[in-house]
UniProtKB/Swiss-Prot annotation:
BP GO annotations: antibiotic catabolic process; response to antibiotic
Enzyme class: lyase
Keywords, in A-Z order: Antibiotic resistance, Lyase, Magnesium, Metal-binding
Residue positions of the active site: 272 (proton acceptor)
EC number: 4.2.99.-
Pfam families, per the entry: Vgb_lyase
Transmembrane segments: none
Binding-site residues for substrate, renumbered to this chain: 231
The protein, known as: Virginiamycin B lyase
Superkingdom of the source species: Bacteria
Annotated positions binding Mg(2+): 270, 287
Species of the source: Saccharopolyspora erythraea (strain ATCC 11635 / DSM 40517 / JCM 4748 / NBRC 13426 / NCIMB 8594 / NRRL 2338)
InterPro entries the UniProt entry points to: Streptogrm_lyase, Vgb, WD40/YVTN_repeat-like_dom_sf
Essential cofactor(s): Mg(2+)
Length: 300
């Protein structure tokens, strides 16, 4: 029987709403951590509590944030060209990649325990250890603009190559392979490992969700609104959820490619990052100054 797909959506205020909530992740402490890209803040929202903030340089442009294997929160400073590490015990530490003006953006923990990041402006992939040692690896195509990155099922890192119109795979020795997308100018951005062992991604330029297996086989699923500009994606249970930055919606896709989308309460809220919280709900960073809690209510 077809499932009735409904959700409950509530918005939560954040400190400095003009700061622009952008990236979001569930921390090892059970709290939600998110970036405020326009004001240079890292914020923490504990369950049932109020948000607290940690200040960076105002123009640092914190973008993507994730939990490291060392229990710290790591994030990219896209405009300051740094990688940041934050703990309640040690405070803030920042590291600059060897390549100047690299534009670090995507960030994910690898199976090797290191943090891997994209250098969007430099067209490279970087690796940083918990001690701050950084290595950089080139890509086979110049100007690829690598965006999001995720650990794959195969002891490798996978990434979206936005301007190369491809999905990339990088082994831990720095060898990169690109898989070209069937749709021209698809401009992939978001990326997540799915429950089926494949990588799922958003095509912001084509209005589609894509899927790539470890051997490079690609499928694409058109969204109901091809102009919706899907941005970030995350796995939850046996489905994946994504943000539609250009259409003020969140959506989900199941492993058979069935899609449903849901309007956000505030018009033009600019949904970007999305994460699964400790409470099992989806939490979305809205660049217009709030977080949205999306609680699926599925009935068979």
């Amino acid at each position: 029987m077809a499932r009735e797909r409904t959700v409950e959506i509530r918005e939560h205020e954040v400190p400095d709403p003009a700061g622009g909530p952008y990236g979001i992740t569930a921390g090892p402490d059970g709290a939600l951590w998110f970036t405020l890209v326009h004001s240079g803040l890292i914020a923490r929202l504990a369950p049932g509590g109020e948000a607290t903030t940690h200040r960076l340089d105002a123009d640092s442009g914190p973008a993507i944030i994730t939990a490291g294997a060392d229990g710290a929160l790591w994030f990219t400073e896209h405009r300051a060209h740094r990688i940041g590490r934050l703990t309640t015990e040690d405070g803030l530490t920042e590291f600059a990649p060897p390549t100047p003006q690299a534009g670090p953006y995507g960030l994910a923990t690898g199976a090797d325990g290191a943090l891997w990041f994209t250098e969007a402006s430099a067209g490279r992939i970087g690796r940083i250890t918990a001690e701050g040692e950084i290595a950089e690896f080139g890509l086979p195509v110049p100007g690829a603009f690598p965006s999001m990155i995720a650990a794959g099922p195969d002891d490798a890192m996978w990434f979206t190559a936005n301007q190369a119109n491809a999905i990339g795979r990088m082994s831990f020795d720095g060898t990169a392979v690109l898989h070209e997308l069937p749709t021209e100018a698809a401009a992939p951005v978001g990326l997540a490992l799915g429950p089926d062992g494949a990588l799922w991604f958003t095509e912001i330029g084509a209005g589609q969700i894509g899927r790539v297996t470890a051997d490079g086989a690609i499928s694409e699923f058109p969204l109901p609104d091809r102009t919706s500009r899907p941005h970030a994606i995350v796995a939850r249970g046996d489905e994946l959820w994504f943000t539609e930055w250009g259409a003020n919606r969140v959506g989900r896709i199941d492993l058979d490619g069935r899609i449903d989308v849901h309007e956000l309460p505030t018009p033009n809220s600019e949904p970007h990052g999305i994460a699964v919280g400790q409470d099992g709900a989806l939490w979305v960073a809205l660049e217009n100054g709030a977080l949205a809690r999306v609680a699926p209510e599925s009935h068979d």
